[in-house]
Design a protein with these regions (language model features):
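A non-catalytic, helix-rich entry segment at domain boundaries
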Residues: 1-45, 51
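Short amphipathic alpha-helical segments and their helix-coil junctions
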Residues: 4-6, 75, 81-83, 144-152
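Short helix-to-loop capping/linker segments positioned immediately adjacent to catalytic or ligand/cofactor-binding
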Residues: 10, 14, 84-87, 105, ...
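Broad hydrophobic/π-residue packing in well-ordered secondary structure
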Residues: 10, 22, 26-34, 78, ...
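Generic recognition of stable, solvent-exposed alpha-helical segments in well-folded globular domains
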Residues: 18-25, 59-60, 91-98, 132, ...
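A short linear-motif detector with a strong N-terminal bias
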Residues: 21-25, 42-45, 53, 93-97, ...
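Mg2+/Mn2+-dependent nuclease catalytic core
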Residues: 46-137
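Metal-dependent nuclease catalytic regions and adjoining charged, substrate-binding loops involved
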Residues: 70, 103-202
Length: 202
């Protein structure tokens, strides 16, 4: 049965029962994929905080970090959804390259392997990073940040509707759905800009 804490999140009755059923599937798949008694992670829920050469801060939380006897690192992240269709794996590959770059920039070591474990369908997506990934990710993130800065300057943020809109907590404020976006707070914009600092001497 769901605990009081669980019920406060998922509700009671049928909703709680559905949530527990879905959780059982995920847990069952996990134990079919891995035997935790054989795992000795070097870290769990590991926070990484790094800066790109441009000075842009990047952060993330890695579910599991494994260290081989020779010191090589493996980055593992768990997903509760299904694995992506091969035609749509680019976003997943981006995440793995992002983690690899963040670890390389913050710890000086490029992970030998990154893995996304999809518990819903019991599949694992594996990618072995290469040194060029760090520069590629840095370039992509810098480009994204430049686009954000342009919109901060113009105070125009064009809606980009997609199927993910149903999950957005700000949907009711979005002009795309008949909402009225609030005025941009100047102090918030200034705070956002602090994500990038001038690069230090090399």
């Amino acid at each position: 049965a769901a605990s009081p804490a669980d019920r406060s999140v998922v509700g009671g009755g049928e909703r709680a029962a559905e949530w527990l059923d879905s959780a059982r599937v995920l847990i069952g798949n996990y134990f079919r994929m891995e035997n935790p008694s054989f795992l000795e992670p070097a870290a769990r829920e590991s926070f990484v905080n790094a800066r790109l050469p441009s000075g842009l801060a990047i952060r993330g939380i890695i579910d599991r970090v494994d260290r081989a006897p020779d010191g090589a690192l493996r980055i593992v992240d768990y997903k509760t959804g299904k694995s992506p269709n091969p035609r749509f794996q680019e976003e997943a590959l981006f995440q793995m390259r992002f983690y690899a770059a963040a670890v390389r920039l913050s710890r000086g070591v490029l992970p030998r392997r990154t893995q996304l474990i999809y518990l819903k369908d019991g599949r694992t997506l594996t990618y072995d990073p290469v040194p060029g990934d760090v520069a590629a990710i840095a370039s992509e993130l810098d480009s994204t940040w430049s686009a954000i800065e342009e919109r901060l300057d113009s105070r125009r943020f064009e809606p980009r509707p997609s199927k993910l809109c149903d999950w957005c907590r700000f949907k009711e404020l979005c002009p795309e759905f008949g909402g009225v976006a609030p005025d941009m707070d100047a102090s918030g914009a200034r705070a956002l800009r602090t994500a990038k600092e001038p690069a230090g001497p090399s």
